[in-house]
């Protein structure tokens, strides 16, 4: 199938709107991606004609809704090549998935004197839960430092492991720098030390295929809303043997086998024991539509288009005076920058006046900002629906801001 950005853009209604009298150039998909009509329509159709509470319902609508939900679990397992659909837990997003692991597996397996390894480039969602766990149990948090070019100092990683290292929690792709970490060698090294590995895949799954069996990671988590799906839904993958050993984190309906006031409660099997309460079934249906949409386009086709667009963007941005770029030359999805001494918020506001949407701030990565000694950065992210013309508008906008502000 030949990739056509014009055909893709036609599927996204919001891309036809104007902002400040100019066509919208949406360069903020790393924060949250726009949704194609196929996703919007699938969720709306479910609410119009198929909604019911899932699980245990004997009536037709409930049975059909349950089947649709479980079919999405199967589709998601194929999307990341999990061995079984029962290795996937529906969560609200990447943040909840990481917190689930920290509060279930972490509480059961990390003790005083143990340690967990993260990196200096992590999103707060892959820092704070581990800080909280370490504070609860008296464990140590160790950090892989950054290089100035936005890659990790991987030569330090072997020195961080010891017999007390329980987990390596690492991002697949940096949400600020676009750095893709060499997971295969990092996971192999961790497993040689008997250490489990959690991968934050929030910024990876939309850009190229992910194969969790080939990676051999123990946990992999991602959000639907960055993958052109709805908000409030994501996937946590856990190797089946590991998942079956983990205790539930939240209690309530749907996650129990039996409840007795005198004899206590027993749990249902995984993954359902981690899905307490009424799920976001509409969001799950929308996620399924997003997975189907992206799979039909072909992730390899998407990857090729996006990489060509990224190379073009980086080359064109060289013409902007006083522009500082952060991150390696080879990157996925995002371009973080600052313009001269001007605050990122000011630059972002000017770009918005030109109809260009970028993200400004610390990007939930304050340790990374501290490393580069800046309070904030601008971030333009490139998705499968962005165009060379939008890149040109970004470059022209930055050149204009430089002329105006000096």
UniProtKB/Swiss-Prot annotation:
Would the keyword Cytoplasm turn up in this protein's UniProt record?
yes
Q: Where in the cell is it found?
A: Cytoplasm
Give the CDD domains listed for this entry: SufS_like
- SUPFAM superfamilies in UniProt: PLP-dependent transferases
Where are the catalytic residues?
364 (cysteine persulfide intermediate)
Tell me the residues on which N6-(pyridoxal phosphate)lysine occurs: 226
Catalyzed reaction equations: (sulfur carrier)-H + L-cysteine = (sulfur carrier)-SH + L-alanine; L-selenocysteine + AH2 = hydrogenselenide + L-alanine + A + H(+)
What is known about what this protein does? Cysteine desulfurases mobilize the sulfur from L-cysteine to yield L-alanine, an essential step in sulfur metabolism for biosynthesis of a variety of sulfur-containing biomolecules. Component of the suf operon, which is activated and required under specific conditions such as oxidative stress and iron limitation. Acts as a potent selenocysteine lyase in vitro, that mobilizes selenium from L-selenocysteine. Selenocysteine lyase activity is however unsure in vivo.
| Protein name listed in UniProt | Cysteine desulfurase
């Amino acid at each position: 199938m030949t990739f056509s950005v014009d055909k893709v853009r036609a599927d996204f209604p919001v891309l036809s709107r104007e902002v400040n009298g100019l066509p919208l150039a949406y360069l903020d998909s790393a924060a949250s991606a726009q949704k194609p009509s196929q996703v919007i329509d699938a969720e709306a159709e479910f609410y119009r004609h198929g909604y019911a509470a899932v699980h245990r319902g004997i009536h037709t609508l409930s049975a059909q809704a349950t089947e649709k939900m479980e079919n999405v679990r199967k589709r998601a397992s194929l999307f990341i090549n999990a061995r079984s659909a029962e290795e996937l837990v529906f969560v609200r997003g990447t943040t909840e998935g990481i917190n689930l692991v920290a509060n279930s597996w972490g509480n059961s397996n990390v003790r005083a004197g143990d340690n967990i390894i993260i990196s200096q480039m992590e999103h707060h969602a892959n820092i704070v839960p581990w800080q909280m766990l370490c504070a609860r149990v008296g464990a140590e948090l160790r950090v892989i430092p950054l290089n100035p070019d936005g890659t990790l100092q991987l030569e330090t990683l072997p020195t961080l492991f010891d017999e007390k290292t329980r987990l390596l929690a690492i991002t697949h792709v940096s949400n600020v720098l676009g750095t893709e970490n060499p997971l295969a060698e990092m996971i192999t090294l961790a497993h040689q030390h008997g250490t489990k590995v959690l991968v934050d895949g929030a910024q990876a799954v939309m850009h190229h295929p992910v194969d969790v069996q080939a990676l051999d990671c123990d946990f992999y988590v991602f959000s639907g809303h960055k993958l052109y799906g709805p908000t409030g839904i994501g996937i946590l993958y856990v190797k089946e043997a590991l998942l079956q050993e983990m205790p539930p984190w939240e209690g309530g309906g749907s996650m129990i086998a039996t409840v007795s006031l005198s004899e206590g409660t027993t749990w249902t099997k995984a993954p359902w024991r981690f899905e307490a309460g009424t799920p976001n079934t509409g969001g799950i249906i929308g996620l399924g539509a997003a997975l189907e949409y992206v799979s039909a386009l072909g992730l390899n086709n998407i990857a090729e288009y996006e990489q060509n667009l990224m190379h073009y963007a980086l080359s064109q941005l060289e013409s902007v005076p006083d522009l500082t770029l952060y991150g390696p030359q080879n990157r996925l999805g995002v371009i973080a920058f600052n313009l001269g001494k001007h605050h990122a918020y000011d630059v972002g506001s000017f770009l918005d006046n030109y109809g260009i949407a970028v993200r400004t701030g610390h990007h939930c990565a304050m340790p990374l900002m501290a490393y580069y000694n800046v309070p904030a950065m601008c971030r333009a992210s490139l998705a499968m629906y962005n165009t060379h013309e939008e890149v040109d508008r970004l470059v022209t906008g930055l050149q204009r801001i430089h002329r105006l502000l000096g």
